[in-house]
């Protein structure tokens, strides 16, 4: 149920009947304050100006054509021409019933699209670090939301599995007796990478062999391809452990690494030359883009093939976008890549559009994100100044959560404690990130993220268990409750019901903007409204059974909405805390 969309269409039709153009925007928004109703239509200002009318005069005319019978109990004009809409309690009650009768809580499915989501993208032969956290969990929350809305989502894990470093790694692997490679763990590979690089820098004979191996690998020699595959397999097996711990939905089947696009690169360079988009410049092949200027104010040159014949990331990203449209048949492509890559992507996509590889009707969207910072406001590092491994971060989260849970539940059985600590610890790390606007940097703070107050995972998980506890105390028969009517008489009942029915609107924003923090804010607000409702509207000690059952149904929909909302974020819920 998308009340905002329903009201938008009703107000738009009334505006047209009042003389507004057919493409007018009613600008229906959820009201910020209860005294302004549940929704507010703010579109009169812009339209009245075009019509040469006072906004309030237009609003009055719109009201004469606006039929919200059975939807709103009151509609009023406020200020210079805002239209405040107060939803009818009977309308709210009816749609709460409908939401409870649906597995999807009444959420409709929009027109199905094929959406490619590019996220996570770790490098082969390196362990995942905290820099991979944001892309991985924000991208996964977007994927979960889009899939819930019924879209066909293709996860694209664009791993760094190609490049000149593989000659060096294969040469070192060979030197270390390659037959043991399959048993190596990634922790070994971290040191393995450093040792290989050290030898490459210090031993010219080794470096020469590594350079030859790159050529053989790139020419498709089966022995070197097999060695390369071992490195990829070891890395992705280890990364899968991290993905599973993080409760993200990526698997090995979602890997679409840089190597996938290699066969396309010569053809793309040749095609861009044939189209007159790419030219030779100082031995390299370059595309000059008018949209980007260099320091002299001239069109910026983007190299797509180096003087030595090598290709660049831009060339790969051009091929990647082309593949996603032509082969995967994407209607929309989302890239969860940090903000530092923005200009690079914009340049690659400008070339893609000019070449006609992806039509303008297919959006290529950079859902960029800021950095994770330490308490000092600098990039998050170990005490020694090194990069924090993601596995180490999750280990610490689990250990801190274990202590926290044991402190609050000293008699809890060990296996139950471990399960709860995992849900709280991993949930806390994810939620702390997801609850911040992805476009900004944020401070990583253990104390804040593990607090049981405020917009945190532990608070949200506790809020869910608190609602469930009402049902345990009620000892209610599910069938009996299902048949009971919902009655909304109190203001707090109406406020909670209206917020519950805004779940679909929240999902729609997350799907459109790729902003999971909007869902976090919604769920936090919902938990707060339930708390006020619970305090002021007695459930178990209600004046009669009809009111008791009605309030239990509001509590039931709250629990279902919290659980489903947290699930779209990849946050685990628990039955007891």
UniProtKB/Swiss-Prot annotation:
Enzyme Commission number: 6.1.1.19
Single GO BP term: arginyl-tRNA aminoacylation
Chief subcellular location: cytoplasm
CDD domains tied to this protein: Anticodon_Ia_Arg (cd07956), ArgRS_core (cd00671)
Top enzyme class: ligase
Name of the molecule in the record: Arginine--tRNA ligase
Tagged with keyword Cytoplasm: yes
Pfam families referenced in this protein's UniProt entry, alphabetically: Arg_tRNA_synt_N (PF03485), DALR_1 (PF05746), tRNA-synt_1d (PF00750)
Superkingdom of the source species: Bacteria
Gene3D superfamilies: Arginyl tRNA synthetase N-terminal domain, HUPs, Isoleucyl-tRNA Synthetase, Domain 1
GO cellular component, one term: cytosol
UniProt motif 'HIGH' region: location: 122-132
């Amino acid at each position: 149920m998308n009340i905002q969309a329903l009201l938008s269409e009703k107000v738009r039709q009334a505006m047209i009947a009042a003389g507004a153009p057919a493409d007018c925007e009613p600008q229906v928004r959820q009201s910020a304050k209860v005294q302004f109703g549940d929704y507010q239509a703010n579109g009169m200002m812009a339209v009245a100006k075009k019509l040469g009318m006072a906004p309030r005069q237009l609003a009055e005319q719109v009201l004469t054509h606006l039929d919200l019978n059975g939807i709103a109990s009151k509609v009023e004009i406020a200020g210079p021409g805002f239209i405040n809409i107060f939803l009818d309690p009977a309308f709210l009650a009816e749609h709460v019933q409908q939401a409870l009768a649906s597995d999807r809580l009444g959420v409709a499915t929009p027109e199905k699209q094929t959406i490619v989501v590019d996220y996570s993208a770790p490098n082969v032969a390196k362990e995942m670090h905290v820099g991979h956290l944001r892309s991985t969990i924000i991208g996964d929350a977007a994927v979960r939301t889009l899939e819930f809305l019924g879209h066909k989502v293709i996860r694209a894990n664009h791993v760094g599995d190609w490049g000149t470093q593989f000659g060096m790694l294969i040469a070192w692997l060979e030197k270390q007796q390659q037959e043991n490679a399959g048993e190596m763990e990634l922790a070994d590979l971290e040191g393995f990478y450093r040792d290989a690089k050290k030898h490459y820098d210090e031993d010219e004979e080794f470096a020469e062999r590594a350079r030859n191996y790159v050529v053989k690998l790139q020419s498709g020699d089966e022995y070197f391809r097999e060695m390369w595959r071992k490195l990829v397999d070891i890395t992705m097996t280890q990364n899968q452990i991290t993905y599973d711990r993080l409760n993200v939905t990526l698997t090995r089947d979602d890997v679409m690494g840089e190597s996938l696009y290699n066969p396309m690169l010569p053809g793309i360079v040749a095609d861009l030359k044939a189209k007159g988009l790419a030219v030779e410049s100082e031995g390299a092949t370059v595309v000059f883009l008018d949209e980007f200027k260099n320091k002299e104010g001239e069109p910026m040159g983007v190299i797509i093939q180096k003087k030595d014949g090598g290709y660049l990331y831009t060339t790969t990203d051009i091929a990647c976008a082309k593949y996603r449209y032509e082969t995967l048949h994407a209607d929309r492509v989302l890239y969860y890549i940090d903000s530092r890559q923005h200009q690079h992507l914009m340049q690659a996509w400008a070339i893609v559009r000019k070449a006609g590889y992806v039509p303008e009707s297919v959006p290529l969207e950079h859902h960029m994100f800021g950095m994770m910072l330490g308490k000092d406001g600098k990039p998050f590092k170990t005490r020694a100044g090194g990069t924090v491994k993601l596995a180490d971060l999750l280990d610490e989260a689990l250990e801190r959560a274990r202590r926290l849970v044991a402190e609050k539940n000293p008699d809890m059985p060990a296996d139950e404690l471990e399960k709860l600590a995992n849900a709280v610890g991993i949930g806390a790390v994810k939620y702390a990130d997801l609850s911040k606007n992805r476009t900004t940097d944020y401070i990583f703070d253990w104390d804040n993220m593990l607090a049981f107050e405020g917009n945190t995972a532990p608070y949200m998980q506790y809020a869910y268990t608190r609602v469930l506890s009402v049902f345990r105390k009620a000892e209610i028969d599910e069938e009996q409750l299902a048949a009971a009517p919902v009655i909304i008489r109190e203001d707090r009942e109406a406020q909670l019901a209206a917020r519950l029915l805004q779940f679909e609107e929240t999902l729609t924003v997350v799907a459109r903007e790729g902003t999971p923090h909007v869902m976090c804010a919604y769920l936090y607000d919902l938990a707060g409204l339930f708390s006020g409702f619970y305090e002021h509207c007695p459930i178990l000690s209600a004046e009669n059974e009809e009111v008791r059952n009605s309030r239990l149904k509001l509590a039931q929909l709250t629990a279902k909405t919290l659980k489903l909302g947290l699930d779209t974020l990849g946050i685990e819920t628990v039955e007891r805390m």
